[in-house]
């Protein structure tokens, strides 16, 4: 019998195409090597207990049974963390048709609310750990679908990009609900976190308002973004050498950031981090995600440390990382 399972799932960045994807245009996303780790084991109480560490809700401990929830510690984000994890556990239990007590412990390298897919990563890692504990052998694609279901249950709407990238890993081209894996490329990147977050809902609504008020100006921007994503896909699929690919992708990143800025979703701080990264030698830098705060990322072959230092000096929180070939990973199974 399995004693416990430790699973991990990565964060993601939208490489190209945020906001325009809402209007039916494509996007390219990738998993990055910042991970959430979930350990699952059985308990004798028949209840489910969740402990979360290092995810901006330090020391959070929550227990719940069929009809009661026990907040053993009082933190504002408790319900937010609980909702993704609880639904993930519930869906895994439904798949196994079992009702048992489970302890889940979570640690994470991914900042919450930064636009890096922390919610999807914790859902995917939880489903991965709990399903394996219960003896299920779900494919990554099946786990991605369950992760998407968790997001729909919690958020009411979801494209499925975040849980799919987190479960499957690598590069994914997304358009109108369909995913296409792209060949893997090593991207030496630095993520810069502003320390603040923007509301995706509000930012999407703001772009929608501008689109409705000035379609003749906004539509060409969105159209250019869509063409840019397809150009990036063309470069990734091309037979150019790696250095040429990186240079061209960096150029597209800079253009994409300018288009996002034109839509009004960048901020002074994001701009400062983007330009600090470029000045320090990044060949491309742009915001990633909804904007209004959150994160930017820089492509910095051979210059990651220098770019990270520049981001820190500019007031950001740098994270040196790389694209993750793997998505969900079962780290350990103890019997």
Swiss-Prot record:
Keywords: ATP-binding, Cytoplasm, Isoprene biosynthesis, Kinase, Lipid biosynthesis, Lipid metabolism, Magnesium, Nucleotide-binding, Transferase. GO terms for biological process: isopentenyl diphosphate biosynthetic process, mevalonate pathway. One of its GO terms (molecular function) is mevalonate kinase activity. ATP binds at residues 111-121. Disulfide bonds: none annotated. Pfam families: GHMP_kinases_C (PF08544), GHMP_kinases_N (PF00288). It catalyses: (R)-mevalonate + ATP = (R)-5-phosphomevalonate + ADP + H(+). Coiled coil: none annotated. Its EC number is 2.7.1.36. Its main location: cytoplasm. The keyword Membrane does not apply. GO terms for cellular component: cytosol. Its cofactor is Mg(2+). InterPro entries: GHMP_kinase_C_dom (IPR013750), GHMP_kinase_C_sf (IPR036554), GHMP_kinase_N_dom (IPR006204), GHMP_knse_ATP-bd_CS (IPR006203), Mev_gal_kin (IPR006205), Mevalonate_kinase_arc (IPR022937), Ribosomal_Su5_D2-typ_SF (IPR020568), Ribsml_uS5_D2-typ_fold_subgr (IPR014721). It is found in: Cytoplasm. The active site is at residue 162. It comes from the Archaea. Pathway: Isoprenoid biosynthesis; isopentenyl diphosphate biosynthesis via mevalonate pathway; isopentenyl diphosphate from (R)-mevalonate: step 1/3. Homodimer. Catalyzes the phosphorylation of (R)-mevalonate (MVA) to (R)-mevalonate 5-phosphate (MVAP). Functions in the mevalonate (MVA) pathway leading to isopentenyl diphosphate (IPP), a key precursor for the biosynthesis of isoprenoid compounds such as archaeal membrane lipids. Belongs to the GHMP kinase family. Mevalonate kinase subfamily. This is Mevalonate kinase. It comes from Pyrococcus horikoshii (strain ATCC 700860 / DSM 12428 / JCM 9974 / NBRC 100139 / OT-3).
């Amino acid at each position: 019998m399995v004693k416990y399972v430790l699973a991990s799932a990565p964060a993601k960045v939208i490489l190209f195409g945020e906001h325009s994807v809402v209007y039916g245009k494509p996007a390219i996303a990738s998993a990055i090597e910042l991970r959430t780790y979930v350990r699952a084991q059985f308990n004798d109480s028949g209840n489910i207990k969740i402990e979360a560490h290092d995810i901006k809700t330090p020391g959070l401990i929550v227990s719940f049974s069929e009809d009661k929830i026990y907040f053993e510690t009082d933190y504002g984000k408790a319900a937010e963390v609980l909702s993704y994890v609880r639904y993930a556990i519930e869906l895994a239990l439904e798949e196994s048709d079992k009702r048992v007590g489970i302890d889940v412990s979570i640690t994470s390298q991914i900042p919450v609310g930064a636009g890096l897919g922390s919610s999807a990563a914790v859902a995917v890692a939880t489903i991965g750990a709990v399903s394996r504990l219960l003896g299920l052998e779900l494919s990554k694609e099946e786990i991605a679908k369950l992760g998407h279901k968790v997001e729909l249950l919690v958020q009411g709407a979801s494209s499925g990009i975040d849980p799919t990238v987190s479960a499957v890993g690598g590069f994914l081209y997304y358009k109108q609900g369909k995913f296409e894996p792209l060949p893997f490329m090593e991207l030496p990147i630095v993520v810069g976190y502003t320390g603040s977050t923007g509301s995706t809902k509000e930012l999407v609504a703001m772009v929608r308002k501008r689109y409705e008020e000035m379609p003749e100006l906004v539509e060409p921007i969105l159209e250019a973004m869509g063409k840019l994503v397809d150009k990036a896909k063309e470069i990734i699929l091309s037979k150019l050498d790696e250095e040429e690919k990186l240079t061209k992708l960096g150029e597209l990143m800079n253009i994409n950031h300018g288009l996002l800025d034109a839509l009004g979703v960048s901020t002074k701080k994001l701009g400062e981090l983007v330009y600090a990264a470029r000045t320090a030698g990044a060949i491309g830098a742009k915001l990633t995600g909804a904007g209004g705060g959150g994160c930017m990322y820089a492509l910095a072959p051979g210059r990651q440390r220098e770019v990270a230092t520049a981001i820190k000096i500019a007031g950001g929180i740098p994270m040196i990382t790389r694209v993750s070939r793997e998505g969900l990973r079962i780290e350990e199974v103890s019997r």
